[in-house]
Amino acid sequence: MAGTQACSATRFSCPPHFTEMSPDSEPSRFSLEALTGPDTELWLIQAPADFAPQCLNGRRVPLSGSKTVKGKLDGKKHRYRVFTSSPQAREATLLASSSEAGGRLTCAPAPSGSLRIMEGPQEYLLSRVPLQLIPTSLPPQIPAGLRPRFSAFGGSPPVTGPGSASALRSPTSGKRKSTRKGTDASSDTQEAVNRHGAMEVKTALGNLGVSVKKRKRYFMQEEMEAKTMEPVAELPVPSATSSKKRKKSKGTETSQVEHTEPVAQTEPPEGTFLFPTKKRKRQKEADGTEEVDGIVADSQPQVIVEAQEETILLSPTKKRRKEKRQNLGMEAEMGPPGVLMVTEHSEHGLQAEVALVSPKKTKKKKGKRVGETEAALPDDFEPQGALAPSKKKERGARL
């Protein structure tokens, strides 16, 4: 049975692309004893068929990574690319002859790594074949009839031309403006209602369609009228002259108050009822004129401003007529309750007083007689000043 098993065992057959060699009697350098030495390492090298190991004599080969190695053989330069890799388990199994086994092949230890040698691009090929240039990318070209759009998604497209301003305006812009105007008008009318407390103003202005500026002016005019009406209610005689007349009257008021001697109207105490006559006037010219001077000093602040402004613009003849009318009207009104003592100075009487009495003595007498007149007058006395003749009359009387 054993013989039959031995006869049936197949012999080792040489694989394809390998040649069978008979072992030499001399020990080979790839014997098992040489490979297992302490100073030797076993590396598996894979190279092309036409590779000549002599071209890499004296060259350093990397044991990790990859490197391009140049070699020279028979005057020709060769370039090889060497790749190294660590051995893997059961990647390759080496069989070596052993002298101990009588020259038979035995399994050798596993190699330390593997080297793969590949042919690189040769220099003569690189020098002869020109390199192909990579074309640079051209900038994008916009075809004719198209326009670039540099706006975000949902934005309005750019519009050029005369109609750009109208096209850019959104259809809702007019509505917004109208609503804003409506809110402004309503706020103005509400303020007016709060100030004056009248809801009719809002409805009237809204129906007329007055603009906002006109409404503001209307309300400002109402405020000014309300302010001006307050002092009118307190004063008995409002001033109706213009601004120009007021400016002229300011300069002349001081001079007229000093020089003029207006006619004083007095009310005597109850029980005496006297009528003004020419005889009494002439009798009391000497004594009454001095008393009138004291009364005039007290009645000067109550001179009516409006009458003074009117006398500046009137001629002297018209002034006299107007004074007579005023005196007659005042006498008609004040006639029944009491008697009005009107003192009028004639030109001859004034000239006589100026000639007899010196100005220094009159000043001293005025201070004394003012106190006498105040004591003689009743408690209810209220002097009312009327307008006196103009400056021309006074100058003529003093001359």
UniProtKB/Swiss-Prot annotation:
The keyword Nucleus applies. Its main location: nucleus. Gene3D superfamilies: 6.20.250.70. Pfam families: RNA_polI_A34. The modification Phosphothreonine is found at residue 277. Component of the RNA polymerase I (Pol I) complex consisting of 13 subunits: a ten-subunit catalytic core composed of POLR1A/RPA1, POLR1B/RPA2, POLR1C/RPAC1, POLR1D/RPAC2, POLR1H/RPA12, POLR2E/RPABC1, POLR2F/RPABC2, POLR2H/RPABC3, POLR2K/RPABC4 and POLR2L/RPABC5; a mobile stalk subunit POLR1F/RPA43 protruding from the core and additional subunits homologous to general transcription factors POLR1E/RPA49 and POLR1G/RPA34. Forms a heterodimer with POLR1E/RPA49. Part of Pol I pre-initiation complex (PIC), in which Pol I core assembles with RRN3 and promoter-bound UTBF and SL1/TIF-IB complex. This is DNA-directed RNA polymerase I subunit RPA34.
